[in-house]
Amino acid sequence: MEAFSGTPVVVAVAAVAATVLLLLLLRGAGRRPGRPVTLRDPQAKYPLPLVGKEEISHDTKKFRFGLPSPDHVLGLPVGQHVYLSAKINGNLVIRAYTPVSSDETKGYVDLIIKVYYKNVNPKFPEGGKMSQYLDSMKIGDVIDFRGPNGLLVYKGSGTFMIKPDKKSEAQRKFAKHLGVIAGGTGITPMLQLIRHITSDPKDSTKCYLLFANQTEKDILLRAELEDIAKRHPDQVRLWYTLDRPPQDWKYSSGFVTADMIKTHLPPPGGETLILMCGPPPMIQFACQPNLDKLGYPKSSTFSY
C-alpha cells in the first residue's frame, strides 16, 4: 500500500495542470497569433499619427494613420466603425468613420473622407469641422481613435448580429441576399462588408449594391467596386444613380426610387437584409419610405 500512496496526488496535480492549460488555450483562442491588436478597449483613446495623405477626387482624400507597430492590426470587426476626436477651436469634435483598409492590414489604417470646405455649400458656410481639421493635419500629427463601435457586426457566411439600440442585446439575422444602398462616403462600410464577403470562398452571400452620388466624378472607389463585381459576377451586382448624370450615362439618374430598389435589389423575404448608409435626407426621404412601400419589414432593414 505504501508504494501507491502518492498516486492520488499525482492525478490531482495532473488534472489541475490540464485545467490550467485548457483555460489558457481558450483564453487565447480569440487572439490572432503574432498580430497585436490596437483597439483593445472600446472606451480608451488611441493616439495615431498621420503617415500619408492622398487626393482621391476634387474634395475627397485618403488619410493613412500608423498603428503602434508594423505588426499591429486595427482590431475592428466587420460592420463596426471608429470614432476620431480632436479639440477644434477649443471644442471637442467627434466623428465616426469606417476604414477602407482591411482588418488584416498590418501597420496602418486608411480612411477615405470627403472634405467639406468653408463657403462652398450655402447651407453649411462653415464647412465640416473634422474633415477640414484632418485636411490641415501634417504628416506626423496625431489624432485620437476610439473603437470598435456600432450596432452591427458581420460574423461571416450571411450571419449578422444587430442591436436595435446601444442598450439592447444583439439579435441574429441571417441573409442569403444582401441589398446595399450607399450615398457618397456612405460607401465605406459597404465596401468593408462586400470585400470581406467576396474574400471568403465559403461565404455565398449575394450582394446587390445601389450607389447614389451627385455627379460621376463623385463616385468614390469606383475602380475597386467594379473590379470586385467583375471578379465575382455571380455574387456582386453593382448599379449607380446620379443627381446630375452626363449625356452618355447608362445607369439611373435622380434620387433613389421604389423602381430602382425593385429592379436592382433583392425582393423582401426572410433571407433578405437591406443595409443603408448615406446622408440622413437620403435615408429618411428616399430609402426608408420606398422600402416601406415595397413591403420590406423593419426587421429586414438597417441604417448605419
UniProtKB/Swiss-Prot annotation:
The chain crosses the membrane at residues 6-26. It is a single-pass membrane protein. It holds the Pfam family FAD_binding_6. It comes from the Eukaryota. Residues 43-155 form the FAD-binding FR-type domain. PROSITE patterns: FAD_FR. Coiled coil: none annotated. One of its GO terms (cellular component) is mitochondrion. It is an enzyme of class 1 (oxidoreductase). Its EC number is 1.6.2.2. It catalyses: 2 Fe(III)-[cytochrome b5] + NADH = 2 Fe(II)-[cytochrome b5] + NAD(+) + H(+). NADH-cytochrome b5 reductases are involved in desaturation and elongation of fatty acids, cholesterol biosynthesis and drug metabolism. Belongs to the flavoprotein pyridine nucleotide cytochrome reductase family. This is NADH-cytochrome b5 reductase 2. It comes from Gallus gallus.
